[in-house]
Amino acid sequence: MPERVFSKEESYTMKKQLALVLAVAMVSASLAACGGTSTAPATTAAPAETEAPAETAAPETEAPAETEAAAAEEEIPDAASLLSDAFIDPVGDWAQYDELIAQIKAETDMAHRTELMHQAEDILMSNYAVVPIYYYNDLYMSKPYVKGVYANAFATKFFMYAEMENGSDTLRLNLASEPDFLDPALNSSVDGACLAANSFSGLYTYNAEGKPVPACAESYEVTEDGLTYTVKLKEGLKWSDGSDLTAADFEYSWKRAVDPKTAADYEYMFSGFDGYDDGEINVTAVDDTTLEFVLAAPCAYMEDLMAFPTFYPVKKEAVESYADWETTPGGWCQEAGFVSNGAFVCTGWNHDTSMTYEKNPYFWDADNVKLEKLEFMLSADDTAIYSAYNSDSVDFIDSVPTDEVAALIESQNPEFYVVDELGTYYIAFNVNSKLFEGKTPEQAACMRKAINILIDRDYIVENIGQTGQVIATSYIPLGMMDGNGGTFKDDPAVGYFDAYAINEDYDGTIAEATELLKAAGFKFGDDGKLDPSTPIDIEYLTNESSGHIAIAESLQQDLAAVGINISIGVQDWNVFLEERKNGNFDMAREGWIADFNDPINMLEMFTTTSGNNDPQYGRK
């Protein structure tokens, strides 16, 4: 990565000063991409007592009446005229989007299906409640004696085949802070998926090459029409308590995942199953080792679904042994000792501090599991995590303080890894936020569009991300397959907006944002900022992490250029997830790493009833 000319602190100072320079001196300036120095000339005040020569003095003239009238009454554009033709009301008309997603999932013509998915993204991006920032990659650090850890493109890390070349049988690591849920049906976070993948086992899993391969399944057959699957399970499958695991456990678990009482965020993953619309998916345990299920339409990514945590089995007796299991469906695994079927079993849990997982002797592939124990440090404090790594208290960490990234890259530290991921870091607006009270749907969209174009993404990826992230101009990430043998998007220059305009045409971008906000009913003062009579005050929600907080602070500076105020609320991980899910925010930091390589995964999460619909689309 090329060096930056400015330090982080200098860059922040430049951004803070820029709005002031523009206001008092009307100087044209631009923020440099990839470290270029500022070329804006210094302002020069005119001598206070110099008279203009008589022959060059402009004659006194009277402004025509038309000019006075134009100055007195500024023409404000209609908000709808500033939006895409794809725009629909994200609350009142969102049923159209829901219907489009249902059509995509039922479509058997793959070329037409791809066209429909592009239409869905057009709608999604036209209302600016989802504001893409960059396409993800992943960084982590691992001691040189740790071997065999691998990850897929969906950010799940697998430790079951890791080995320690330092003679230890224990891997000490940090992934995140206290997990929200360990019940695989209820989890919706990346760290939770990692814990689930190492303590539960589905029909399929992923190998070191990132390909889905059989796990509890021995094989499967599918009918010629692509609708009916018959899966044969491996013989002798066991739960961690030594009891038999059968096809009936999968039937129970899948039906439980779509039961409204379970309230699984990912229940819509089963929406392609026959019977889903009637509330009873078509899945049957034919016998102890045979599972049959029927789809409503062919699914090209069925193996990925069979490897996804929501499709993992849970033991009915364990789930229902919890006293309040009907009202607290995840209560059965809120403490150590719960029954699972993966490579490791949770045997110790000091909440908010540590977790211990030990090898499960009943795991179907236990002979190939070399580690005896995983010891997790639970923390979101990346400075403390990095310190623990450097003091050899942990062997593997999944986050690094923002301030340390540049030095790690420059020194080519062999313990520092950056790997590709399939996902997008973005900002979400709550479409029902008080920010938009009294505004038409079009005016609210203009507000969000103005904020979108004011964001300096180049600064974020170069100074905060620092690991080669690609600026996002669409929600669907680069490289995602289109379900028809091609890629949905493979050119970063093609997108829904010019992400570099704020750098290359600062004055023009500020003017465009101002026009959008005026169309939304806001007034501006002579200083080019919002008039106090029509303020915009935004509460921005994020979780603990130096990188997320730095991005929030960068947004704070960007939006201050037109007088928008942002207050940053930093919350613990579990509280953050709950507040965001319940729509208790104006703006929130978001990120979505694909669960499988098909755009529908990124699009169906925004249907009205989806448990991952944080922007509250379609909800009133």
Please name every model-derived segment.
Residues A65, A70-E73, A80, M110, ...:
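Ligand/substrate-recognition segments at binding pockets and active sites
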Residues A72-L171, N350, L454-D490, G547-Q556, ...:
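Detector for C-terminal structural segments
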Residues P132, Y140-M141, N174-E224, V339:
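N-terminal lobe/hinge region of extracytoplasmic solute-binding protein
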Residues Y145, E221, E267-S321:
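Surface-exposed binding/hinge segments that line
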Residues M160-A162, E218, D225, V294-P313, ...:
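Aromatic-rich, solvent-exposed beta-strand/loop patch
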Residues E218-Y266, V286, E292, A388, ...:
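Aromatic- and charge-enriched surface segment that lines or borders ligand/interaction sites
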Residues E251, P361-A407, N565-S567, D572:
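Ligand-site clamp/hinge motif
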Residues V470-A520, E544-I549:
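Structural transition elements
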